[in-house]
């Protein structure tokens, strides 16, 4: 088991980096506590896999250190780090049985046969592989093969952490939830540090206790799923997390009022942004309500989508597109309507970053 510390870590694939843009992974300082379930979330190319490969030892960082507990492992080889890594595509030996695949890491370390057999049985029960232990891996489905890959990482009792790099990519959609649930059960049973890399917000938010969101090589926010949804620290987080994502509207802010085109929005906090900064108002569609015309901010309806659990209106206000929730039992004649914004759920951003204003009674928020 291990606490993983990233100390002033950065990486560039070019040999002579000079500017921040030269770095695929911009400087990161972060600690993953022992036994936690974490996710690295972000779009393709944001640096997730680079970071994972640095932790596992497949890539040496350009600068900074990786520590397991208080031990500097930056220059240690992968096999010396006691790390297990599960990749996008299952890594199994098709000519071997499931039992032989699970036993292989222990056999390579000359673990006695009786201990190996016992450990293989334990992991097989945990992963529901007991009934196929003596079948050839070549005859199994992709999700079963991925379970074998996971089992080969878990079978070593000395593993400090398990790293998952998009492990459900090849799994059928209807089986993904089941395998995610299995991972959560394993985490609870073994109390092992797990770091899960994905571009899929559903996978990250349902697996992890804390999520690290990455964008353009940098960490933009770390928090619980609730924190990321309720208080995004960056406009990217607001837009990337949620379906649909947060409405992000260019605005001008004066005190406790935001100006969006020719419309004004009252705020619950007072802001004093520096001159020249790009200001934006963010609010999630769940907190924007479509109403009959004349009862709020005037908008034009472009379409209304029924997404099963709710109806989402796509509207235009002062030339800006945004999404709003449609209350049950309300219908609209024509394309003219109004919006009501919940002032408690409005966030103000300067150059993409959340701004803390002062509440009307003078406190910071």
Question: Language-model features: where?
Answer:
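Short beta-strand immediately N-terminal to the Walker A/P-loop
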Residues: 38-39, 85
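Non-catalytic connector elements of ABC transporters
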Residues: 244-246, 256-365
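Helix-to-loop junction immediately C-terminal to a conserved catalytic motif
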Residues: 56
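Conserved coupling/switch loops of ABC nucleotide-binding domains, chiefly the family-specific signature
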Residues: 62-65, 216
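ABC ATPase nucleotide-binding domains
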Residues: 82, 92-236
């Amino acid at each position: 088991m291990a606490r993983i510390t990233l100390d002033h870590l950065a990486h560039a694939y070019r040999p002579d980096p000079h500017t921040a843009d030269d770095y695929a992974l911009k400087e990161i300082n972060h600690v993953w506590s022992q036994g936690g379930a974490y996710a690295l979330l972000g779009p393709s190319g944001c640096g997730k896999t680079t970071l994972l490969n640095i932790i596992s030892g497949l890539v040496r960082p350009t600068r900074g250190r990786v520590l397991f507990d208080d031990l500097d492992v930056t220059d240690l080889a992968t096999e010396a780090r006691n790390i297990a890594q599960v990749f996008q595509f299952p890594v199994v030996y098709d000519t071997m049985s499931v039992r032989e695949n699970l036993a292989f890491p222990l056999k390579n370390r000359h673990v006695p046969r009786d201990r190996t057999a016992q450990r293989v049985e334990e992991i097989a029960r945990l992963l529901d592989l007991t009934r196929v232990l003596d079948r050839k891996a070549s005859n199994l489905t992709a999700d079963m093969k991925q379970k074998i890959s996971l089992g080969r990482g878990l079978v070593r009792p000395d593993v400090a952490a398990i790293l998952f790099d998009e492990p459900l990519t090849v799994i059928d959609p209807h089986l993904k939830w089941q395998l995610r649930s299995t991972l959560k059960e394993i985490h609870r049973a073994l109390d092992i540090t797990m770091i899960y890399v994905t571009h899929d917000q559903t996978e990250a938010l349902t697996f992890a206790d804390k999520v690290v969101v990455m964008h353009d090589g940098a960490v933009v926010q770390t928090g619980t799923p609730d924190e990321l949804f309720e208080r995004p620290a960056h406009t990217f987080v607001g837009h990337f997390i949620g379906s649909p994502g947060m409405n992000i509207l260019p605005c001008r802010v004066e005190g406790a009022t935001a100006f969006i085109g020719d419309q004004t929005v009252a705020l619950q906090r007072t802001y004093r942004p520096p001159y020249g900064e790009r200001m934006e108002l963010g609010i999630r569609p769940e907190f924007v309500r479509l109403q009959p015309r004349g009862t709020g901010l005037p908008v034009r309806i472009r379409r209304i989508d029924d997404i099963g659990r709710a109806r989402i209106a796509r509207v235009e206000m002062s030339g800006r597109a945004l999404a709003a929730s449609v209350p049950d039992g309300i219908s609209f004649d024509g394309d003219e309507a109004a919006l009501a914004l919940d002032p408690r759920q409005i966030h103000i951003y300067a150059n993409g970053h959340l701004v803390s204003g002062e509440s009307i009674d003078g406190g910071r928020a």
